[in-house]
Each structure stands twice: as C-alpha cells, then as structure tokens.
C-alpha cells in the first residue's frame, strides 16, 4: 500500500470516527452475575443535546427498565428530531430552558456543548431535578466550578453526576475494587493518558472545540487516579505544553489564546504520591484513554501484580469484574462504560444515595486540568490545586 493510500485511509478513518472511543465496546463482565432490579419505578428523564456524536442517546437511558424518556431537546430542529427518534420519545422542546419547565421530568441528562455544562446543570438543579452531565464539569472557569459546587450542596436531595467514561474502564474498575478493599495500600504513582489526534478543528457549537486547551478536557486521564482510588484528589501541579505546529493551535487562531496541542502534567496527590497525566491533540497514532497504577502492595496494568503471595491471596477474593447490567441495556462505548454510568445514575436516585462520580470527584478531576493549563502557560510553574469534598 502506497503512502498516498495510507494517508487517504487515515483521513477516511478520522472522518468516520470524529470522536475517539465510540468503537471501544469490549469489556470484562462477570458472566455469573445477574442484574437484580432495585425497584419497579420508572424515573422520568429528559435528555438535552445530540451534537456531533449523538451523545444524548449514547448512554442508553431509553433502554433502561427503570427509565421513561419523556422529552428531549436540541437547539437544532434536525438534531432534536434525531434525538427523539433514537430515544423513542415524542415530546420535544426547543431548549433546555423550556424542557426544565416540564414538571413531569424528574432528572435531566445534559449532553450539550462543554462551555454550557455548569450553567445548564445549575439551571436543572434549581428547577428541582436530578442532573447527569457529560464531561467536563466546567470549562476553564474556576468561578463556575465554585458556583456549581455551591449549587449542588444547596440542593440537598438532588443528585449531580458527571459521566466520566474512564470510571468504568476495566482497569479503573478493577483497581478501584482492589483499592477500596485495602488490598493495594496507598497509591504511589499513577499515569493517565488521553490521545485524540485532530489536525483540523472538529465541529462544535459556537466553535467550542477550536484550539481547545488539552488540559481543559482532562477527566479521561485524571480519572485513572481519582476514580481508581475512590475519589482522592490532586494537590499541586507542574505542567508543560508543546507549542503545536497545527494552525488551529496557534494562540492567535483560537478563542482561548492557546498555543498547545499537547500538555503533560506532573501532580502531587492527596495521598502524597505522584501522577503524570497527559492530554494530546496533535500527535498521530493510537487514540483513546489508557493508564496504569503502582501502589504500595501491587501494581495494575491490564492485570494485577501483587507484592507477595499473601496479597495475591487476598486479592483473589475480590471480584474485579463488572457486574451484570439490565438485559436491555448494553455496556456501550468507551470501554463498555456508557451503560454502567447510566445505571449508576438511575440506581443512585432509586436508592436515595450519592452517585459514584459526584460533584467532588467531578471537580477534582476537572479543576486539576484547569490549573494544569495555567501552569503550562507559565512554563511549568508549580501551582496549588483546589480540592473539593462532598
């Protein structure tokens, strides 16, 4: 195959897969487990946002036995119609603001453009509804982070959950099971990487993806520490960026004044350990999310490697495979995570408990990236990272 054909094939693949991760559907499920319903109640859900990758319909709310999708919305009529068709829903609204006036809706999935996430989630919560949101929680704005945080705390009894897909990657799930059982001890070193090559701007509402700072979209990589350790956080960071050769990552050519196509952060963790978290938009090659963890009593990279036989025996008693989902709900994309995120949000409401990726987890992943980008703009200056508890 000639170089021209290889290049053409690569370009075609990029067109067919504009967003990385949607073709990654394999996952490790405990085949002996059986899903047991928590209730026969159906939560009435509204979904907002269809977008470039049909995201509002991608997490399976329409297929969950405890959900009735009663209304959908997108600002563009053709996309709204597509979302309604995918969700098998007849009622549509022209905007999120109109949808949340519907008193029959109990919960809303916000799958809108990233800059709108905090404002939209605040509006949903203030309308008296639970909210699940696509990543990231906020868009480069610390004030928005604190405002969202205070709104969630003020609206006790309503759930906020961020749908970070790495949470249910096989490796992150397995590490979390071992960590929460006390098998690993403290986490010494974590790595998370998110690679998504786009040599040209991807479409986005009002151009929000144009030249976006890599560490403003940090949660896929940061989850390899935060979600692997059940919610621990980062305390300080030194981050470096690479000034990209691509025109849309020239500071004068994008709305963020961002010169970087790749940013790599070295962070101190709340356990006293270290984490290296990378996000890259301008390096060709394999794309997706990956990571690894090294702890006091063992390491996990595709498999668990214990320090000794005693730890190995203890680990053998922990089920590190994901449990069964409702038979009608597929695990979905991004490492078989979509269905699990949907199910966790639904069951957290049914059981009146906090969801797994609550506001603290969400902001501890997102804000660390915001500070990392600030550090990169200051040539790696070490900066403190705010931490959130809930």
Where in the sequence are the language-model features?
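Contiguous beta-strand/loop segments that form the cofactor/metal-binding neighborhood of enzyme cores
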Residues: 23-39, 216-308, 339-355, 369-373, ...
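N-terminal secretory signal peptides and thylakoid transit peptides that target proteins
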Residues: 1-7
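Glycine- and charged-residue-rich phosphate/anionic-cofactor binding loop of Rossmann-like
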Residues: 68, 348-365
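C-terminal capping/lid region of NAD(P)-dependent oxidoreductase domains
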Residues: 158, 185-189, 374-390
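Predominantly a Rossmann-like dinucleotide-binding segment in NAD(P)-dependent oxidoreductases
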Residues: 154-161, 166-258
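Conserved SAM-binding strand-loop segment of SAM-dependent methyltransferases
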Residues: 89-96
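N-terminal Rossmann-like dinucleotide-binding module
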Residues: 7-87
